[in-house]
Design a protein with these regions (language model features):
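Hydrophobic, well-ordered secondary-structure elements that form the walls
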Residues: 70, 82, 115, 154-156, ...
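Carbohydrate-binding surface patches
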Residues: 133-166
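Residues that flank catalytic or metal-binding motifs in active/ligand-binding sites
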Residues: 95, 111, 138
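Solvent-exposed beta-hairpin/edge-strand motifs
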Residues: 167-176
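Aromatic- and carboxylate-lined catalytic core of secreted/periplasmic carbohydrate-active enzymes
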Residues: 11, 99-132
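C-terminal beta-strand-rich structural cap/linker in extracellular carbohydrate-active enzymes
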Residues: 180-205
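Conserved alpha/beta catalytic core and glycan-binding cleft of carbohydrate-active enzymes
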Residues: 1-92, 157-158
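Acyl/amide activation-and-transfer machinery of modular secondary-metabolite enzymes
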Residues: 92-100
Length: 205
């Protein structure tokens, strides 16, 4: 939380809104591989290495959360070709192989299209101010606002549930309404929320 606010306070808004938000580049291992289980092996072993189905499932869950932040934080989401298709690979040259035409992860591609549409539908996400509302214990909530639009981004990377204020949920993953109307984020859940009460307190406890 403090790191985000330090960036927001030390860069002009015009600059912050144009920074390139990368998860992967041609000079780094594929983000899906980074988010999988650690592997130390020879260059030949890394060339042949692919995640097990269980490892890949975990890495994909982490990537969905990371991409959600990539599209909701200030800056321009920049996607390295193939990351949206689920490509794996260690450092150069393994991160630069051909795009997997006809073998893409279509579910992941659809998710990236949905994130792009979500950002495109919200001026607050594209150009809004950033304010960190709560951070700690594996949880973070921040708002993006401009003009009359204000949205709250919440990510739960803790081991327990996180109860959030009631409101309109514009996007959610691993979330459910409570009997009293609040939004409950499960472990690994995240959402884009418009709280019914703009002054509602968000606790990380």
């Amino acid at each position: 939380g403090e790191s985000l606010m330090t960036l927001a306070e030390n860069y002009p808004p015009e600059v912050l809104s144009c920074v390139m938000n990368h998860l992967g580049t041609h000079d780094t291992p594929r983000i899906l591989t980074v988010l999988g289980e650690p592997f130390r092996g020879t260059k030949d072993e890394r060339a042949r290495r692919r995640m097990t189905p269980v490892q890949r499932k975990t890495a994909l869950m982490r990537l969905r959360m990371a991409a959600f932040l990539q599209f909701t934080l200030p800056g321009m989401p920049c996607i390295y070709y193939g990351d949206e298709a689920g490509m794996e690979g260690f450092e150069d040259p393994f991160c630069r192989v051909c795009y997997p035409w006809g073998h893409e992860d279509e579910e992941l591609r659809a998710y990236y299209r949905m994130m792009s549409a979500l950002r495109g539908s919200s001026e607050a996400l594209r150009r809004g101010d950033l304010r960190v509302l709560a951070a700690g214990n594996g949880r973070i909530a921040f708002s993006r606002s401009i003009g009359g639009e204000r949205v709250v981004v919440c990510v739960n990377h803790s081991i327990g549930e996180w109860v959030l204020p009631a409101g309109r949920v514009r996007f959610a993953e691993s979330a459910a309404p409570s009997p009293t109307g609040e939004v409950v984020l499960m472990r690994g859940g995240f959402c884009l929320l418009e709280p019914s009460d703009p002054e509602a307190h968000i606790s990380i406890e």
